[in-house]
């Protein structure tokens, strides 16, 4: 991977836009959850520390764009435009239609899907019924129609190139280029890549503290990556931020 990154740099390209782009490769590979059931201690898995080390190394080497700090901001969006020198993004399936396509201002067919460095997952789309609804049966019917009706799910996948929760349907889509190719991707059928990769995704151990830990460790170490604070200060900032958000946590 580093050899490829070095070759891309020689050609004037960044491998990825931001250190935040690679986080899920590491975060989805942790061996234990941030907080074990019944405990009040946050454990930072070695995979997360590997991300910190590699992110600093890659940023200093010029394999990532230093001007792009995190995700979901203007610089990150612009990194998807036709004037960008970013080679790839580590998106979920929904990132193509929801994020990449709206930010792209060039010709269709400039982007394509390929296998990631390793399997990972990044959230998804969810539907909820409100507690106390006056129409529980209707709510049930809507939820089942959106999550368990194969025809509906395949239509979502066809219209938005999104990976939906019908295993047999996604296997069919992977071999149906006529119906599931993407104009934005120059006629490529992304499901030919999505379906086999999804088979090997392993969900990381979860806890109720995941969102906060993931958010705060990226925020705290961003200044370290940018050279504004040293490692120890970034670590201390993370510990402080955790205890401020989760007063019940006794140790980090």
Language-model region placement:
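Long, aromatic- and glycine/proline-rich binding clefts that accommodate carbohydrate-like moieties
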Residues: 158-219, 223, 249-252
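Short helix-initiation/N-cap motifs at beta->coil->alpha
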Residues: 1-2, 67-79
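Bilobed periplasmic-binding protein-like "clamshell/Venus-flytrap" ligand-binding domains
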Residues: 9-20, 151-160, 244-252
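Periplasmic solute-binding protein
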Residues: 11-40, 121-129, 190, 195, ...
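Glycine-centered hinge/linker elements that transmit conformational signals in sensory
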Residues: 5-8, 40-70
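Extracytoplasmic/periplasmic substrate-recognition and gating elements
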Residues: 102-168, 199, 219
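Alpha-to-beta junction loops
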Residues: 11-14, 82-92
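Beta->alpha turn/N-cap motifs
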Residues: 19-22, 90-99
């Amino acid at each position: 991977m580093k050899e490829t990154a070095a070759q891309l740099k020689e050609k004037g390209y960044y491998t990825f836009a931001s250190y935040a782009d690679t986080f899920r490769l590491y975060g989805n590979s942790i061996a234990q959850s941030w907080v074990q059931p019944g405990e009040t201690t946050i454990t930072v898995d070695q995979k997360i520390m590997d991300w910190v080390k590699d992110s600093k190394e890659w940023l200093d080497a010029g394999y990532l764009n230093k001007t792009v700090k995190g995700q979901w901001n203007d610089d990150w969006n612009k990194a998807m435009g036709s004037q960008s020198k970013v080679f790839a993004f580590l998106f979920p399936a929904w990132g193509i239609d929801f994020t990449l396509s709206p930010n792209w201002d060039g010709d269709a067919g400039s982007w394509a899907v390929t296998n990631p460095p390793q399997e990972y997952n990044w959230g998804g789309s969810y539907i909820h019924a409100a507690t106390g609804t006056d129409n529980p049966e209707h709510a049930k019917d809507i939820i089942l129609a959106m999550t368990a009706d194969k025809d509906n799910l395949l239509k979502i996948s066809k219209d938005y190139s999104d990976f939906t929760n019908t295993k047999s349907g996604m296997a069919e889509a992977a071999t149906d280029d006529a119906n599931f190719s993407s104009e934005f991707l120059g006629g490529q059928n992304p499901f030919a890549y999505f379906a086999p990769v999804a088979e090997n995704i392993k969900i990381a151990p979860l806890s109720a503290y995941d969102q906060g830990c993931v958010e705060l460790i990226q925020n705290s170490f961003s200044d370290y990556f940018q050279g504004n604070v040293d490692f120890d200060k970034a670590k201390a900032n993370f510990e402080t931020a955790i205890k401020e958000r989760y007063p019940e946590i006794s140790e980090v």
